[in-house]
Amino acid sequence: MRHKLMTSTIASLMFVAAAAVAADPTPVSVVGGTIHFEGKLVNAACAVSTKSADQTVTLGQYRTASFTAIGNTTAQVPFSIVLNDCDPKVAATAAVAFSGQADNTTPNLLAVSSADNSTTATGVGIEILDNTSSPLKPDGATFSAKQSLVEGTNTLRFTARYKATAAATTPGQANADATFIMKYE
């Protein structure tokens, strides 16, 4: 009997102790990281969509044998810049200029480079064209054809392609970066 009483007392104390531990956990706080918030308020006719602000246009892979003369080009690859919340009463049109490192031999093209330590292709640059197929020099001052704005969302369409700057090309990475400037009138 005494053994049962001791066993039941020990069991009761264990339940009370377990409940006390479970009911009163000590909170722990630790720094988890940093979140960067970026944005901009603009006094303009439209706001550039966040999906258009930073984008990658994949031009593809081409054989060097495809470029046999200066001026040879690859297929045009479409891309667009989406404008949101447009108010055509503020400005009736929008145009875009691109700015980037110009090719040394053909300054109306973007110079190509490699993002890492890999070999950079030579004899080729990247050409950007507007919706009228007019080439846009990457000088930040050559604007695309004006597009009339409608209220709400507007899409400005462009294409890009590789263009030979020499009669012979060499293989390697052929990447370029360009920023774009909006002009509303």
From Swiss-Prot:
* Coiled coil (residue ranges): none
Q: Which SUPFAM superfamilies match?
A: Bacterial adhesins
UniProt-listed Pfam families: Fimbrial (PF00419)
Compartment(s) of residence: Fimbrium
Keywords of this protein's UniProt record, alphabetized? Answer: Disulfide bond, Fimbrium, Signal
Q: Which Cys-Cys disulfides exist here?
A: C46-C86
Q: Which domain of life is it from?
A: Bacteria
Q: What is its main location?
A: other
What's a BP term from Gene Ontology annotated to this protein?
cell adhesion involved in single-species biofilm formation
Q: What is this protein called?
A: Fimbrial subunit type 1
**Species this protein is from:** Salmonella typhimurium
Organism taxonomic ancestry = Bacteria, Pseudomonadati, Pseudomonadota, Gammaproteobacteria, Enterobacterales
